[in-house]
């Protein structure tokens, strides 16, 4: 059973690799960002509207909301043989709540990249909302401009993919999520999971090859 967490700042390459690895090992790719955007699009409840506004400014959605969302998803049947969590947990409380909920993983993989690379990547990013598939107009373009490779549906730009929100998200990541990396480095010393750091500044194919080697080792 393969249970993986991908952590890293937005634009570090983890989203692209999450789709590739999930397809390779036939496990669900659980992207918190995609799940939130889908949930917020479907709902008119006031609490969802609040979280929608939080996302668009680059702030973090509260821990209780996120843990409930992820716990519900992981308990679905398609996760029995494994899963890949893309971008969760984002805070120490979320990480500890996972442990309390008996959600355990085999691999923690940290992606890192420079801020300049991240901003360049995100500015050109295009998203297929229905699946969460991610493209880039320069580095990873779709076969047909502006259209998803699988469905042919129109790709969109996220509302929080502007520079001010990007910098806010990076600030939140360094403040809240980097301590999570320290937490998992310590946890990995007990040999219940493996922790790896991956250079996300490189080409997609090179990163993918390294990930396959890590998971196969």
Swiss-Prot record:
GO molecular function: adenylate kinase activity; ATP binding
Location of the protein in the cell: Cytoplasm
EC number: 2.7.4.3
Family membership: Belongs to the adenylate kinase family.
Catalysed transformations (reactions): AMP + ATP = 2 ADP
Pfam families: ADK (PF00406), ADK_lid (PF05191)
Protein's recorded name: Adenylate kinase
Gene that encodes the chain: adk
EC top class, as a word: transferase
Annotated transmembrane regions: none
Pathway assignment: Purine metabolism; AMP biosynthesis via salvage pathway; AMP from ADP: step 1/1
GO terms, biological process: AMP salvage
Subunit structure: Monomer.
Top-rank taxon, per record: Bacteria
Lineage: Bacteria, Pseudomonadati, Pseudomonadota, Gammaproteobacteria, Enterobacterales
Region of interest (LID), residue spans: 124-161
GO cellular component, one term: cytoplasm
Purpose of the protein: Catalyzes the reversible transfer of the terminal phosphate group between ATP and AMP. Plays an important role in cellular energy homeostasis and in adenine nucleotide metabolism.
Domains as described in the record: Consists of three domains, a large central CORE domain and two small peripheral domains, NMPbind and LID, which undergo movements during catalysis. The LID domain closes over the site of phosphoryl transfer upon ATP binding. Assembling and dissambling the active center during each catalytic cycle provides an effective means to prevent ATP hydrolysis.
Record HAMAP family: Adenylate_kinase_Adk
Sites where the protein binds ATP: 11-16, 125, 134-135, 202
Source species: Blochmanniella pennsylvanica (strain BPEN)
This protein's UniProt keywords: ATP-binding, Cytoplasm, Kinase, Nucleotide biosynthesis, Nucleotide-binding, Transferase
Annotated binding of AMP, by residue: 32, 37, 59-61, 87-90, 94, 158, 169
Major location category of this protein: cytoplasm
Residue segments, region NMP: 31-61
């Amino acid at each position: 059973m393969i249970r993986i967490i991908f952590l890293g700042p937005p634009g570090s390459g983890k989203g692209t690799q999450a789709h590739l690895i999930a397809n390779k090992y036939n496990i669900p790719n659980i992207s918190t960002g995609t799940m939130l955007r889908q949930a917020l699009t479907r709902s008119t409840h006031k609490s969802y509207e609040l979280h929608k506004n939080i996302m668009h400014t680059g702030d973090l959605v509260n821990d209780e909301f996120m843990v409930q969302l992820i716990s519900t998803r992981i308990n679905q049947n398609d996760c029995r043989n494994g899963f890949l969590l893309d971008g969760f947990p984002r805070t120490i409380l979320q990480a500890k709540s996972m442990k309390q909920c008996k959600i355990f993983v085999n691999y923690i993989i940290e992606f890192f990249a420079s801020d300049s690379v991240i901003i360049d990547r995100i500015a050109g990013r295009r998203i297929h909302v229905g699946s969460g598939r991610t493209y880039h107009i320069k580095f990873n373009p779709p076969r047909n401009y502006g259209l998803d490779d699988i469905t042919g549906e129109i790709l969109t730009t996220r509302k929080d993919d502007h520079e001010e929100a990007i910098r806010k998200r990076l600030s939140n990541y360094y403040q809240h999520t980097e301590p999570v990396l320290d937490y998992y480095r310590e946890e990995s010393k007990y040999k219940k999971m493996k922790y790896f750091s991956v250079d996300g500044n490189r080409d997609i194919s090179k990163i993918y090859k390294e990930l396959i080697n890590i998971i196969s080792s």
